[in-house]
Amino acid sequence: MESPQAKKSGLNLPAGMSTITSLRLETLSTPPSSASPRAISNLSSTPSPSKSSKCSDRFIPCRSSSRLHTFGLIDNQSPVKEGSNEAYNRLLKSELFGPDFASPSSSPAGCGVGSPLVSPSKNMLRFKTESCGPSSPFSPSIFGRNDGFCNEGFTPPKPPRKVPKTPHKVLDAPSLQDDFYLNLVDWSSQNTLAVGLGTCVYLWSASNSKVTKLCDLGPYDGVCSVQWTKEGSFISIGTNGGQVQIWDGTKCKKVRTMGGHQTRTGVLAWNSRILASGSRDRNILQHDMRVPSDFIGKLVGHKSEVCGLKWSCDDRELASGGNDNQLLVWNQHSQQPTLRLTEHTAAVKAIAWSPHQSNLLVSGGGTADRCIRFWNTTNGHQLNSVDTGSQVCNLAWSKNVNELVSTHGYSQNQIMVWKYPSLAKVATLTGHSMRVLYLAMSPDGQTIVTGAGDETLRFWNVFPSMKTPAPVKDTGLWSLGRTQIR
């Protein structure tokens, strides 16, 4: 039976609590419709008897036994750490959901746990390719990736150029001498290869593989050097007796014989009109085909045999190397060397001028030196050097790309291709069983031929073809280009 107090208060209380506790509600001054949870106050209980209750419908924790002080051990993150975490979160979102998701302007300021994973303004399906361009500093395109979002602007790195490791042609060259100081192979601008074999000079046409015997010097003489003119129609031959012979390569006819050297002429070099010859007599002679005298100039500076000669690309300077370990640079208007470079510690036979940069000269030393050195002939400073680990026999610069090739002796007898100015190795080619003493380049600049004492000539495809510039299109009469009236 309900107690009178319970019936009066309108509360349904358990039977056991009808006489134990009593609740008192204060009268509210505001109408019930506008009451808020805070309007109910002063819930108090009347003093309970000494007998405690055995059950209750609420659980009130004991604050005295709670370890509330442990929450104070959590340190607030520093602004620097919070900034780094924010940057990492934006970058991660950008990688996963695209660059627009990581943009601070595209995301609401109050983005919290309940925020959607995609922007409300974005559709789930995309029906067109979006334009490229990073919308935030955390866009993937800045870091070299743009997977699936903007592939048009991403350029993959170029793979390294592959150079064939084997020669595409091998020719027998019997009686090809194994002498470091001779220069017995040259390739003309008309695609004809000249080779000195013993007392004879042979011509091999790269166009039709036809072999022609140009001359035979006889049993008491020998071929020490060959060199084509720039036009490729005449060839000069240095002999063991010190003479220089000029031959017409098309008619196989001797044009002239010039003397002046006391002993063998081991190196020759043509510019537009002057032929320079170096000899074991330590002298360099300058010959002019237009005058009747044997030579027009004599350059004295080396203390031993001259074994390397090269004219610069503009025909203004002549570089000479000798067995005295010296590299000399001569001006065409002076009888004295303008530069005397003595850093090499062995004979300097390998010499080459860069066709891509004026006043850039490269030289290589013999067995005791093994270094390739780069020079600025304007001030005589050494720009760089690299130790190849073996005798440097020849050097040639590519006219198609900024690379050069070197041939070497003991112990690998290798051919090496270098990238300039990084001096990174592009390729290392092997095949000769003896030191690679002779080197020449084809007219198109793609193929080199190497010769060695193993009596073989090997042809290698080393350099790429020259890129032809795109023709300039005339946009009409009012174009900014030059027009011809008549």
UniProtKB/Swiss-Prot annotation:
Biased composition (Polar residues): 27-36
GO BP, sorted A to Z: anaphase-promoting complex-dependent catabolic process; cell division; positive regulation of anaphase-promoting complex-dependent catabolic process; protein ubiquitination
Residues covered by region (Disordered): 27-57
Motif window: PEST motif: 24-36
Similarity-based family: Belongs to the WD repeat CDC20/Fizzy family.
Record's comment describing the protein's domains: Both CSM and C-box motifs are required for binding to the anaphase promoting complex/cyclosome (APC/C).
PANTHER family noted in UniProt: CELL DIVISION CYCLE 20 CDC20 FIZZY -RELATED, PROTEIN FIZZY-RELATED 3
Protein's UniProt name: B-type cell cycle switch protein ccs52B
Species of origin: Medicago truncatula (Barrel medic)
